[in-house]
Amino acid sequence: MGRVGSRGRDGGAGRGHRHGDDGVIYQQHNLVTQLRVVHNVLAGQLGSWSTLGSLGSLVAPAAAQRETARQALAAVGLEGQIDAITADLSGGQQQRVAIARVLVQDPTLILADEPVASLDPRTASDVLETLLRLQRQGGKTLLVSIHNVDLVRRHFSRVIGLTDGRTVFDGRPDDLNETILATIYGAQRAEAIEG
């Protein structure tokens, strides 16, 4: 178990304190699947609303809120799903809803914790490409925790390998070799390489 900090703040300190500049995409989506997509996307703004505003958004989002959600969904290729029940979407679509939820926060830093672990290879590549496109277009900092070395090699320009809380590699994916992978992954090396 590790800790992450940003802008001089320990990410574990002051639980409950809202770090508005940070957006998090979780491995398990963390969506309320019984709700419509629009409500899950707008949940990214809950921290900036009053209790009454939050309840109003849940009952009937205002036109401006719907437009915010529509724009975020358009950025991830799901504009037509704004009123869909989230449970009716595929795993890849649900992960895109989770990304849209982060986009409405407009964070400067996006932390993605194994964002494609539960997805098939094609969908995983599509989701990573979406994240990277949004990072480039929006000037965001993107930090992705991912263990699939094949996906890392195909999609990222920089890799930082950690073992026991210390950096053991910081370089280009092309420079990852068997020795470095053995240092990073130990006994799980084959699983990480094959995905």
Regions found by a protein language model. Give the residues of each.
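Conserved ABC ATPase "signature" region
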Residues: 49-80
